[in-house]
């Protein structure tokens, strides 16, 4: 009986919805922040608004905005969110509902795109956030008369692009994390859980362990630790399967390693986090305050990586931007390196990297490391001092790379002069240990050869040499903040 009553009510409700046309809602983006939705009053007793930002509604779901308004004001029913931060190009999907004379009426499938801003009084604003002048007698330009209709922007637009809809103003801060709160997986950063492989084949596995990845004293902390510390003395000779939580490609060596006579499981646990799922950008200025780690064969990763790898997935053919790198050995700790990488092997691997040699080790204290990336050039600076600039040559990087036998370089011809650095990149922070490309064979006290089958075994067998250099107070990469600005 109850079910029958409900069905009858539902039929009556749906029929009633068809009997009266709900007035179109007026949506307004308010500067500097706010959303206002309203309809004119016509004797209604309730107005409800349900909507989502940049995501379609699934039927009659509640949505991000879900509000019932029970009283009209000055002849209109008004929903207001005073904290909404809307950008040009943002799209709101919504449905509305009204009650009149005890019956409900609904308007579905609403869509609205932000094309400009208004002030609190509803007056449209110009590019300077001032009300558009109504005193001028000159008619506005018409479409087809030299100016196409389109949105008005409250600022001078930047060449920078971001991975979320909307416009970007010149000099606008696009991203900031001061690491004042614990890492929340996926909220901003995603920890990588995998075995890194080609092209550098470092001697570590990325994991999310409290001892090697955490936030403390306002800093991101990433440090290395032997695998045997976490998993026992024979861990390097046992299969390590990360498949149930691996962020790499399942079914490959990125998620599972089996040891053999010549190959051990990577003997060091480090960490790496990225913003691939939450934030990526094209062109901008990256500023990162960090204290570099000290210890033999430690390689801090402070870099930008391509989201889609449109020019190829192997050997850095889609590019890698090193914001800063100071290797931890005593012979390297006074040498800062930054810039673009477009090949895994020499001589082109380091052809465009720039160096800044200091009188004091870069590992002693925090420094502000900056990389500015534009459609024409990539510029590196530290503490406000520019130490390197790579300008895209006429015709792009193809010619010089082709001369160095970089086979995939021909793909860059499809892009702009700065290709492969003309696509979206995300932020990556982490640490590698050793590997087959970062350290030349002539490095002091290096216990392995880059081309040796037992390179990782030889590294591990020499732990009595390098492990004492990993002091607890020095071996961590510390990051105070990460900021990205539009050009």
UniProtKB/Swiss-Prot annotation:
Subcellular localization, as worded in the UniProt entry: Secreted
Signal peptide: 1-19
GO cellular component: extracellular region
GO terms of molecular function: carbohydrate binding; hydrolase activity, hydrolyzing O-glycosyl compounds; pattern recognition receptor activity
Residue intervals of the GH16 domain: 157-487
Chief location bin: secreted
Keyword list, A-Z: Glycoprotein, Immunity, Innate immunity, Secreted, Signal
Biological process annotations from GO: carbohydrate metabolic process; cell surface pattern recognition receptor signaling pathway; innate immune response; regulation of innate immune response
Tissue expression from the record: Fat body and hemolymph.
Protein family (similarity comment): Belongs to the insect beta-1,3-glucan binding protein family.
Record's protein name: Beta-1,3-glucan-binding protein 1
Domain CBM39, residue spans: 20-119
Functional summary from the UniProt entry: Involved in the recognition of invading microorganisms. Binds specifically to beta-1,3-glucan and activates the phenoloxidase cascade. Causes aggregation of invading microorganisms.
Subunit details: Monomer.
Post-translational modifications: N-glycosylated.
Gene3D superfamilies membership: 2.60.120.200, Beta-1,3-glucan-recognition protein, N-terminal domain
Region described as Disordered: 123-151
Residues linked to a glycan: 368
Naturally occurring in which organism (per UniProt): Manduca sexta (Tobacco hawkmoth)
Database matches in InterPro entries: BGBP_N, BGBP_N_sf, ConA-like_dom_sf, GH16, GH16_GRP_C, Glycosyl_Hydrlase_16
Compositional bias of kind Low complexity: 133-150
Xref: SUPFAM superfamilies: Concanavalin A-like lectins/glucanases
């Amino acid at each position: 009986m109850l079910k029958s009553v409900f069905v009858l009510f539902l039929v009556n409700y749906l029929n009633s919805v068809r009997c009266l046309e709900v007035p179109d809602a007026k949506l307004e983006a308010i500067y500097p922040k706010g959303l206002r939705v309203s309809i004119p009053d016509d004797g209604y007793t309730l107005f409800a608004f349900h909507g989502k930002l940049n995501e379609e509604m699934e039927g009659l779901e509640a949505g991000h905005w879900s509000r019932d308004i029970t009283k009209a004001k000055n002849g209109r029913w008004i929903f207001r969110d005073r904290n909404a931060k809307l950008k040009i190009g943002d799209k709101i999907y919504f449905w509305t509902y009204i009650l009149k004379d005890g019956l409900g009426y609904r308007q579905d499938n609403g869509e609205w795109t932000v094309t400009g801003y208004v002030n609190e009084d509803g007056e449209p604003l110009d590019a300077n956030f001032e009300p558009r002048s109504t005193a001028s007698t000159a008619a506005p330009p018409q479409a087809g008369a030299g100016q196409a209709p389109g949105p008005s922007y409250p600022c001078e637009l930047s060449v920078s692009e971001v991975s979320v809809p909307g416009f970007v103003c010149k000099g606008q801060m696009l991203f900031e994390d001061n690491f004042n709160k614990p890492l929340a997986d996926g909220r901003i950063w995603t920890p990588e859980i995998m075995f890194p492989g080609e092209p550098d084949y470092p001697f570590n596995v990325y994991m999310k362990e409290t001892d090697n990845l955490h936030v403390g004293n306002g800093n991101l902390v990433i440090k290395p630790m032997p695998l045997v510390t976490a998993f026992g003395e024979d861990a390097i000779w046992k299969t390590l399967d990360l498949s149930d939580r691996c962020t790499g490609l399942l079914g490959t060596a990125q998620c599972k390693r089996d040891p053999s006579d010549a190959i051990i499981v990577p003997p060091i646990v480090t960490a790496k986090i990225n913003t691939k799922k939450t934030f990526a950008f094209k062109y901008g200025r990256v500023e990162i305050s960090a204290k570099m780690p000290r210890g033999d064969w430690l390689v801090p990763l402070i870099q930008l990586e391509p989201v889609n790898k449109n020019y190829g997935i192997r050997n850095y053919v889609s590019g890698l931007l090193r914001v800063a790198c100071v290797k931890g050995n005593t012979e390297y700790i006074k040498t800062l390196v930054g810039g673009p990488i477009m090949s895994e092997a020499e001589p082109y691997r380091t052809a465009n990297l720039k160096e800044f040699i200091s009188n004091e080790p870069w590992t002693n204290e925090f420094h502000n490391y900056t990389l500015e990336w534009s459609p024409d050039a990539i510029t590196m600076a530290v503490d406000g001092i520019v130490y390197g600039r790579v300008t895209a040559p006429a015709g792009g990087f193809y010619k010089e790379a082709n001369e160095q036998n970089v086979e995939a370089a021909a793909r860059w011809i499809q892009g702009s002069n700065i290709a492969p650095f003309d696509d979206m990149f995300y932020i990556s922070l982490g640490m590698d240990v050793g590997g087959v490309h970062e350290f030349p064979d002539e490095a002091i006290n290096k216990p392995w050869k880059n081309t040796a089958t037992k390179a990782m075994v030889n590294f591990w067998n020499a732990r009595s040499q390098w492990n004492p250099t990993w002091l607890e107070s020095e071996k961590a990469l510390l990051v105070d903040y990460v900021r990205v600005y539009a050009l």
